[in-house]
């Protein structure tokens, strides 16, 4: 009975969670009774810890409602349920066994990455420096890293396609290469190809010019994993979209892994055919958001450590509080600080950083103000600027106001009382409540999460 109720529990979770949350955390679970205990199996430690932390109370509550004092105790484990292991292993064998490497004749469209090479990394254009171990994880990219790890462990079987989207310099490309390195580590013969979407277009043009389109098709449809960066550049390139459509279908039919990245959610990409946008969402779509303060600090500390520099904590926080848009900007700023310190021989202090980054910091202070945030949010939600300062409490006004307060805390250096004062003289506790509410809604609502990411991108661009 408990096992059948588990299926009902799954159905309830599907109703309560977003499609992405359900696909990511609940769908991979299996369950089986062992005596009076319902054992829930997760595919790996990351999923197990996440489900136990986030959803255990919901699961316990469901069984208590249905069975009262007869509700089974719950236990979590890693793996698959024992009675199902033969089936699971057989499925896994089909999905995870990598196809024997096929010799592919060098196509006459003659692109560098198409040449058969002894070195798998060179052949694949996978950068060996991008690993999961040196990817700094935070709330902004946690789901993306978790999904990428599972794809690396089970290419073609975990999430296919995996679609990562977010602004420039947030780590999407790092994750692509990390997955590629993971696949090649597990199977050195795997044919993993990474490229920018423009390269795919260029290859197709060359193939058409050289009357070699069949070789082009054979090459791209023979790879074990295809990773394409910035898929939005396919916009309005009809012939390229047509060819990629058929390549996409062929790879998926063969359980070959596809990972795509974009600066926008699939359905928001202009100039791309609906049938492609639909397919982009067949697997798992994950947003990579701008890093929060703690992650920005961790990125700076990691980068400094790699450069052999002792970066004081207060300096890392000073930089992280002022440069918020993306990882690339942070690393560039730190490189400038390090170069200046090496050149002048001066210690790295807050005053030194102010001097070394004065133009960059001045630009940031000029661009992002509370007034600018209020105007941007009001325009985004189509409310009046006066509503930001009013006492109106209707959700259509209160939610944008809370969003603007949360963004003001994230993107400016103003204190909570100063932010409250800028919103019609509100108390700092009102601002704190708004920040916590938006943080909660970003976890629960895909729409709010999207709004927040879109506004961050707009204000940071």
UniProtKB/Swiss-Prot annotation:
Region Domain III, AAA+ region, residue ranges: 125-341
Assembly description: Oligomerizes as a right-handed, spiral filament on DNA at oriC.
Places the protein is found: Cytoplasm
GO biological process: DNA replication initiation; regulation of DNA replication
UniProt binding sites for ATP: 169, 171-173
Stored SMART domains: AAA, Bac_DnaA_C
ATP-binding as UniProt keyword: yes
Any Pfam family hit: DnaA_N
InterPro entries, per database record: AAA+_ATPase, Chromosome_initiator_DnaA, Chromosome_initiator_DnaA-like, Chromosome_initiator_DnaA_CS, DnaA_C, DnaA_dom, DnaA_N_dom, DnaA_N_sf
One term of GO molecular function: DNA replication origin binding
Region annotated Domain II, chain positions: 87-124
SUPFAM superfamilies on file: P-loop containing nucleoside triphosphate hydrolases, TrpR-like
Region (Domain I, interacts with DnaA modulators): 1-87
Domain notes: Domain I is involved in oligomerization and binding regulators, domain II is flexibile and of varying length in different bacteria, domain III forms the AAA+ region, while domain IV binds dsDNA.
Role noted for this protein: Plays an essential role in the initiation and regulation of chromosomal replication. ATP-DnaA binds to the origin of replication (oriC) to initiate formation of the DNA replication initiation complex once per cell cycle. Binds the DnaA box (a 9 base pair repeat at the origin) and separates the double-stranded (ds)DNA. Forms a right-handed helical filament on oriC DNA; dsDNA binds to the exterior of the filament while single-stranded (ss)DNA is stabiized in the filament's interior.
GO CC terms of this entry: cytoplasm; plasma membrane
UniProt superkingdom: Bacteria
PANTHER family (alphabetical): CHROMOSOMAL REPLICATION INITIATOR PROTEIN DNAA (PTHR30050:SF2)
Region (Domain IV, binds dsDNA): 342-461
Region (Disordered): 99-125
Organism for this UniProt entry: Shewanella pealeana (strain ATCC 700345 / ANG-SQ1)
Lyase keyword on record: no
PROSITE patterns for the chain: DNAA
Protein name: Chromosomal replication initiator protein DnaA
Protein keywords: ATP-binding, Cytoplasm, DNA replication, DNA-binding, Lipid-binding, Nucleotide-binding
Family, as annotated: Belongs to the DnaA family.
């Amino acid at each position: 009975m408990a096992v059948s109720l588990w299926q009902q529990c799954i159905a309830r979770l599907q109703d309560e969670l977003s499609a992405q949350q359900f696909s990511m955390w609940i769908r991979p679970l299996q369950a089986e009774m062992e005596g009076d205990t319902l054992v829930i199996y997760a595919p790996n430690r990351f999923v197990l810890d996440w489900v136990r932390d986030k959803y255990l109370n919901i699961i316990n509550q469901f069984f208590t409602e249905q069975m009262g004092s007869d509700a089974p105790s719950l236990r979590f484990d890693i793996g698959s349920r024992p009675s199902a292991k033969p089936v699971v292993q057989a499925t896994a064998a089909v999905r995870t066994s990598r196809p024997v490497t096929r010799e592919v004749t060098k196509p006459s469209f003659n692109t560098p990455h198409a040449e058969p090479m002894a070195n798998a990394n060179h052949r694949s254009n996978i950068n060996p420096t991008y690993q999961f171990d040196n990817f700094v994880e935070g709330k902004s990219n946690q789901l993306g890293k978790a999904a990428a790890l599972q794809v690396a462990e089970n290419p073609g079987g975990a999430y296919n396609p995996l679609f990562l989207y977010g602004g420039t310099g947030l780590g999407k490309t790092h994750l692509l290469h990390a997955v590629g390195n993971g696949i090649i580590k597990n199977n050195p013969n795997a044919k993993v190809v990474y490229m920018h979407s423009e390269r795919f277009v260029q290859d197709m043009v060359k193939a058409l010019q050289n009357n070699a389109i069949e070789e082009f098709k054979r090459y791209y449809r023979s790879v074990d994993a295809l990773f394409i960066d910035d898929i939005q550049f396919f916009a309005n390139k009809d012939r390229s979209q047509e060819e990629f459509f058929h390549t996409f279908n062929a790879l998926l039919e063969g359980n070959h892994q596809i990972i795509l990245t974009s600066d926008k959610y699939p359905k928001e990409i202009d100039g791309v055919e609906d049938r492609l946008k639909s397919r982009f969402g067949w697997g798992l779509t994950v947003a990579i958001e701008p890093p929060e303060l703690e992650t920005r600090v961790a990125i700076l500390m990691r980068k400094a450590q790699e450069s052999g520099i002792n970066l004081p904590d207060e300096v890392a926080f000073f930089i992280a509080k002022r440069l918020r848009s993306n990882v690339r900007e942070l690393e560039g700023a730190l490189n400038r600080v390090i170069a200046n310190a090496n050149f002048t021989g001066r210690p790295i202090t807050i005053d030194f950083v102010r001097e070394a980054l004065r133009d960059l910091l001045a630009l940031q202070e000029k661009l992002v103000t509370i007034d600018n945030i209020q105007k941007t949010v009001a325009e985004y939600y189509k409310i009046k600027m006066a509503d930001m300062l009013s006492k109106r409490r209707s959700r259509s006004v209160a939610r944008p106001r809370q969003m603007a307060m949360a963004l003001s805390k994230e993107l400016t250096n103003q204190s909570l009382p100063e932010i409250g004062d800028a919103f019609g003289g509100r108390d700092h506790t009102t601002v704190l409540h708004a920040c916590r509410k938006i943080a909660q809604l970003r976890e629960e609502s895909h729409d709010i999460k999207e709004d927040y990411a879109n506004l961050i991108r707009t204000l940071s661009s």
